[in-house]
Amino acid sequence: MEPSSPEPQAGALTVRPSSLCIAQVEQNHTWDVRASAEVALPGRSRPASRVPCKDMAFPRNQKLNLLRLTVLLIVALAGIKFIFRDSVTPDLHKHISKDNDFWGKAGEEKEEANPHNQALELSAVKIMGPKEDTKKQLSKDFSTTEMRLVHLDLKGAAPKVSYLEQVFPLLSKLGANGILVEYEDMFPFKGELETLKSSYAYSEDDIEKIQRLAALSKLEVVPLVQTFGHVEFILKHDKYRYLREVERFPNSLNPHLPDTLSLLKSILSQVMDKHRHSSWIHIGADEVFHLGEGMDSKNWISLNNGDVGKMYLNHIKEVVNFIVNQYKGLQVLMWDDMLRKISVGAIQESGIPKHASPVLWFYAPDFDTEQIGKFISKYADSGFKSVWFASAFKGTTGPAQAWTPLNYHLKNHLSWLKVIQAMSKFPFIKFQGIALTGWQRYDHYSVLCELLPVGIPSLAMCLQTLVNGGFTEATNKKILDVLGFQNIHLEKSTCEGNGAFPGSEIYRMVEQINGQLKESIAKVLEEESAIKGWFSPYHRKHQFGNPRNLENFGSKVLKVHEDWENFIQNFRSQLESIYFPDTVEEWMEENVNPYMDRLREFVRDYREIIRLNAKPKAL
């Protein structure tokens, strides 16, 4: 809830005109205190002084004394105003609007509340929405432009800005004209929202630089802010736990608490105030897990004929209305999956289609295009003026996927091409663009999917397929020329050549780790018969062995270990040039250390035991 203009409260400095012999300034209904005034100090009050005037004759000395008294009062007033000037403003800021029922009316005794409500009230004091001053976005005309947005999922493995500086020109060259930036905890939230940001969050200067770099490559920047589901990065914090739809799960917001909307307004305002040149904002709103399971929602549903869809729309309507009223000219995008279950009439009644566009997302290689057509017809009937689609170039084939399957994602885009080419069947709704999603995590708590450099060959194929209307010979040639490869093997998901794109070193090294690290270590440790016979886990546990037998396999194991350690050291350096330390450590822990640690422990035991020169086993 937004605070209204505060009224003066007890303890604040006030200046009251005396009732007689003062000069009233009629303009603006203000008072000229030069003639006579009375100062009311905090905690005190006294009757206004009565100063006789007109037709009253005074001796000369009395007139002088009165003049001196007046001067002294003016000086005293000025001094008191100076001393107390800093105490007035904070008191006014602390005032809570008496018109805000959630906070309770000023001067009234609050009703006794249950502990749950008390907890909400105490926490809610910290969440004050922004002052709603209407702001105008920079107007651009995209009426004849089909947008191709590349999704940057920054909830994991967020690249350094220096890497984005290299990547943006590549995206433009491949056919993108925008980026969909899902900041999550990488945005430099400040004030009460500072809790939300990561230790490695971008700075405000970084956000500005990202937009400047995007503009240089003619890429429209579309920020994405989740406003209902997938808000784990918010609800994981104790400070905001009470806003969960279901207390156990941090996935979705409770739409019935006033603080939910106040918090979202603050988040949206901070993000949009840093994106004044953006034409769209994406509010997420997909996969609102457990909606309707919270007690507040159950109570609402029981009073509204079980209409969960209407409950969903009510919340989205509040979010959309705030955006369009606060930022004139800004257009809203939202994922469509929750809308699929809601009736046309309910969507029409909500008014959302006036200001928002649904983004239909399907990531499978051969999805049902006829079903997509039914959804498009539904959204046209609901009153939406335009529709967007969402494909995937990486991050949808498994939560721990490290290597991108090229053919899988190419087929997904070929399916979307069929839909795009059939849009003439839907004259009452316009196709505005497609977002090529590149998910980095399935959610805030999952491990990393494919790194961005690993997904670039797939992204290049998908973008060029959309640009050229298919995966043609010309498409293939353009991809090879831009990326610096000699050939692409779709079924094997590999590319011939070293590559010459930003991050190509990481692409090649991840390919080796993904295809060779586990196998080479398993081969040297498990397939060597001498190890099974003379250096078993039992030998290692009791620290005994014959050097004559150990040396039969030792040099081979040591060579494999040395080669991989050198490789991993180089790989880590490449990662550190693009990613922040937390990403480097996470990727190594998940994809390298489980195999390398096994080899390292083996080599450590080997070196210790061979130095013992065939001593008896330790008991």
Label every model-predicted segment.
Residues 57-72, 79-84, 126-137, 165, ...:
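Substrate-binding groove of N-acetylhexosamine-processing glycoside hydrolases
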Residues 68-74, 83, 87-94, 200:
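Extended acidic/polar, glycine-enriched regions
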